[in-house]
A protein has these predicted regions:
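Helix-rich interaction surfaces within compact, conserved domain-sized segments
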Residues: 13, 67, 73-111
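Amphipathic alpha-helical interaction elements
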Residues: 53-60, 78, 87
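Metallocofactor- and cofactor-centric catalytic cores in central/energy metabolism, strongly enriched
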Residues: 30, 34-53, 57-58, 65, ...
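A short, ordered amphipathic alpha-helix with a cationic face
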Residues: 18-24, 58-61, 72-73, 84
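N-terminal first-folded block
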Residues: 5-40
Length: 111
């Protein structure tokens, strides 16, 4: 277990860097988690983060890659609902990284 430290909070993470307590998530935590992944959040990132949190609220699980891309396509259109777009924002393991930054558990079927 590790911890995410800042002047504003001290939050426990699992061994892969996911929040142990989902209720501890907020936008400041997201910025710190993104920083740990070498990502500087832009409005494009926040759009996906909000969407993945909406998916979690609806289905009670973080989406794996294919489900994430399909959901983005449905909600934001075909320009953004492509693997290349989401990977450009969150890297090669986009579903895992986006879920982590969004304060959600690791998606099922993600190695």
């Amino acid at each position: 277990m590790s911890k995410l430290h800042s002047q504003a909070f001290d939050i426990s993470l699992d061994d892969e860097g996911y929040l142990l307590t989902l209720d501890h998530w907020n936008e400041l935590v997201a910025v710190e988690l993104a920083s740990g992944e070498n990502i500087k959040l832009t409005e494009a990132h926040w759009e996906i983060i909000r969407l993945i949190r909406k998916f979690y609220q609806r289905y009670q699980q973080a989406p794996a890659s294919r489900a994430l891309i399909n959901y983005v396509r449905k909600e934001l259109g075909s320009d953004k609902g492509r693997s290349v777009y989401v990977m450009r924002l969150f890297g090669g393991s986009a579903a895992k990284t986006a879920a982590k930054i969004a304060g959600l558990p690791k998606p099922d079927n993600c190695i």
